[in-house]
């Protein structure tokens, strides 16, 4: 360290400031560095925005673009102005993870459009999306085609795509709807398997594979597996063959997080993960009796169309006044309607139920006399979420120990990107659920995914039964089941761990006390 740097370091430590840095800052308008963080805005543009329009923040720039002031200053067209807005959205997401509920529909629209093109052989998601992480940084897509350039050209002109960040003959990056960055890579068919494996990740999983390969005298890369002694490269069109070459059972993408999946794959003892087709019904949904948008019959028919054997109608209880919750009298009427519907419809069974509020003191907001008449009782916290860990844990324990309760819904109460989980001792909750033979929910609402994969893995590990439920408030929401299944797969869940993989007769036995 030289004398000048030593002086600056001493000044910074003793005063908390650095005069040299403060002098540099004074030469630039306040907040201009915020503008420079936006891709496409350089020093000259930022200086004009600040000096001529008084814009020194991202928020101010957004408002100026929307009002047309920026377009007027720089004589920009509508598309350029829209690109600036998309870059602002992308910047705001840069330090945030994108919920899978936002990313997956965008990816599926793009994939659907490109798969219809002639000559497209393979096209799929990779990265965090393929591993079904609950949040992701961007969307990675890859595929093979007879004419890769045609696919790339079509990709950048899709209606979902805004600004193109980069484009070549086999790769492109662009900003899609909502500021999502999408990267598309077209590869050679004979290398598709190894490239898909590499770009699916995770990074630590791939490191584990490389270490294993090295011990076998092999070098792994995105292009295939090279035998070090002969420098011979093997390419893999099929991902399963890549794993087989390493002496491993195929590892599903959801498990590739460097836990113990490589060791288990070596032993051939990976779980047979639950699949969407294993789900026999949905036990948590709402109708227009409370805050849902469809009638009981409409929800039932939609579920039957999905091939379900059963559903449970679990509208909110009266404590959720904002949700038009059911009091005892309305619940009695709903029970009668459900029973009449069961007599009239065939091909599906409808369970009576309720999502009853767990009050702040741990009591339920409906009495035993009415709860005991229901087929399924789900209990959930919807209020007083700022309680201490001790009080919240005791509150939920009271519900678990209540003989009327079957399932605890969204146990941590989180909302992705909006509300942090409540303070609760989940290990205590899991142990109590196991002891009392109670079911914990994997709520499949994309903004909940609660329990998450880590918590669901622990619950499964101590033999707590889980239920994947959509919490649907409309017929369209029934499709959210796939998000819950993704969480369960990441939690290493097999069908036997999930309550609603049971056929109707077995579920009836379970609810009747055969737990």
Positions of PLM-derived features:
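Accessory alpha-helical DNA-binding modules that contact the DNA backbone or grooves
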Residues: 1-172, 193-195, 207, 214-228, ...
């Amino acid at each position: 360290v030289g004398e000048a740097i030593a002086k600056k370091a001493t000044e910074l430590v003793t005063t908390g400031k650095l005069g040299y840095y403060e002098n540099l800052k004074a030469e630039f308008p306040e907040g201009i560095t915020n503008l420079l963080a936006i891709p496409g805005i350089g020093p000259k543009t930022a200086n004009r925005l600040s000096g001529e329009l008084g814009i020194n923040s991202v928020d101010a720039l957004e408002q100026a673009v929307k009002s047309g002031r920026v377009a007027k200053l720089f004589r920009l067209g509508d598309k350029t102005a829209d690109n600036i807005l998309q870059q602002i959205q992308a910047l705001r997401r840069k330090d945030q993870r994108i919920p899978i509920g936002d990313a997956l529909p965008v990816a599926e629209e793009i994939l659907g459009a490109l798969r219809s093109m002639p000559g497209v052989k393979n096209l799929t998601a990779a990265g965090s999306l393929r591993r079904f992480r609950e949040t992701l940084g961007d969307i990675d897509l890859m595929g093979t085609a007879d004419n890769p350039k045609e696919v790339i050209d079509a990709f950048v002109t899709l209606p979902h795509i805004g600004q193109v960040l980069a484009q070549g003959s086999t790769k492109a990056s662009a900003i899609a709807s909502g500021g999502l960055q999408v990267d598309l890579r077209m590869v050679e068919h004979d290398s598709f398997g190894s490239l898909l494996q590499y770009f699916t990740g995770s990074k630590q999983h791939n490191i584990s594979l490389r270490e294993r390969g090295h011990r076998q005298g092999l070098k792994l890369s995105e292009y295939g597996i090279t035998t070090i002694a002969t420098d011979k490269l093997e390419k893999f069109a099929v991902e399963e063959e890549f794993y087989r070459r390493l002496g491993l059972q195929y590892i599903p993408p959801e498990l590739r997080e460097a836990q113990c999946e490589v060791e288990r794959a070596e032993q051939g003892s990976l779980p047979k993960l639950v699949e969407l087709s294993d789900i026999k019904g949905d036990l948590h949904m709402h109708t227009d009796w409370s805050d849902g948008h469809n009638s009981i019959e409409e929800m039932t028919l939609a579920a039957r169309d999905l091939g379900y054997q059963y559903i449970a109608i679990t509208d909110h209880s009266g404590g959720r006044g904002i949700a038009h919750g059911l009091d005892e009298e309305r619940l009695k009427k709903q029970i009668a309607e459900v029973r009449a519907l069961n007599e009239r419809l065939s091909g599906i069974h409808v369970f009576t139920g309720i999502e009853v509020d767990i009050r702040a003191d741990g009591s339920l907001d409906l009495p035993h006399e009415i709860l005991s008449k229901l087929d399924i009782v789900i209990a959930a916290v919807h209020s007083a979420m700022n309680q201490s860990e001790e009080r919240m844990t005791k509150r939920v324990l009271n519900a678990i120990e209540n003989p009327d309760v079957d399932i605890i819904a969204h146990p941590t109460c989180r909302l992705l990107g909006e509300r942090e989980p409540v303070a609760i001792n989940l290990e205590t909750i899991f142990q109590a659920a196991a002891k009392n033979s109670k079911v914990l929910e994997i709520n499949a609402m994309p903004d909940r995914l609660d329990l998450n994969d880590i918590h669901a893995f622990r619950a499964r590990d101590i033999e707590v039964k889980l239920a994947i439920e959509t919490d649907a408030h409309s017929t369209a929401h029934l499709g959210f089941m796939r998000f819950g299944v993704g969480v369960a797969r990441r939690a290493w869940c097999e069908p036997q761990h999930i309550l609603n993989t049971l056929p109707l007769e077995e579920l009836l036995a379970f609810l009747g006390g055969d737990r």
